């Protein structure tokens, strides 16, 4: 007979997996002190991600019940990272691990839009620009022609003013 807490955790885990459309990272957090775990949660939260600690059996059961593939790495302590932007979450995890002398949290694997990711895939994902960075680049690309047009039109107006001033001076003389 499953206990009430596990039933609630399973329901929450399934709800989060459905909301994330089956996209998440699986990480090992073992050896991370409570203070640093809290700091990791805060860093992830700032980037629209969330750390959810659950037993491997519950993670396996939730994946199975939702028809998602079982991932490698469901051994030892595991936490699931749900995210809005996979690149921002991957960057946060990789940077946090680099700043930790033990290299924790360790990414085990992940699932992104139905594709199984290895730890190396997640590290490669962290090298990509985030959605906000891509949006900023797009705005810059779109603004450049407009800025050039404004400069050209401003130059034409300055030349016209110069011609009119020269004409006025010539008439006055």
From Swiss-Prot:
InterPro entries linked to this entry: Ribosomal_uL10, Ribosomal_uL10-like_sf, Ribosomal_uL10_bac, Ribosomal_uL10_bac_type
GO cellular component, one term: ribonucleoprotein complex
Pfam families linked: Ribosomal_L10
Any one GO MF annotation of this record: large ribosomal subunit rRNA binding
PTM section of the record: The N-terminus is blocked.
CDD domains reported for this sequence: Ribosomal_L10 (cd05797)
Disulfide links within the chain: none
Record function comment: Forms part of the ribosomal stalk, playing a central role in the interaction of the ribosome with GTP-bound translation factors.
Full protein name: Large ribosomal subunit protein uL10
Source organism of the structure: Thermus thermophilus (strain ATCC 27634 / DSM 579 / HB8)
Top-level taxonomy: Bacteria, Thermotogati, Deinococcota, Deinococci, Thermales
Gene responsible for this protein: rplJ
């Amino acid at each position: 007979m499953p206990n009430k807490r596990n039933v609630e955790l399973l329901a929450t885990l399934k709800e989060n997996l459905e909301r994330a459309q089956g996209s998440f990272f699986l990480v090992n957090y073992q050896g991370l002190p409570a203070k640093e775990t809290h700091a990791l949660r805060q860093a992830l939260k700032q980037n629209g991600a969330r750390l959810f600690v659950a037993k491997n059996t519950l993670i396996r059961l939730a994946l199975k019940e939702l028809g998602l593939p079982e991932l490698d790495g469901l051994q030892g302590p595991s936490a699931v990272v749900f995210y809005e932007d996979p690149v921002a979450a991957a960057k946060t995890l990789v940077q946090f691990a680099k700043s930790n002398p033990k290299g924790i949290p360790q990414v085990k694997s992940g699932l992104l839009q139905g594709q199984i990711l290895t730890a190396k895939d997640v590290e490669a994902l962290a090298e990509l620009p985030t959605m906000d960075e891509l949006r900023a680049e797009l705005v810059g690309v779109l603004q450049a022609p407009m800025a050039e047009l404004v400069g050209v039109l401003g130059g034409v107006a300055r030349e016209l003013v110069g011609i009119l001033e020269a004409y006025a001076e010539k008439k006055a003389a």
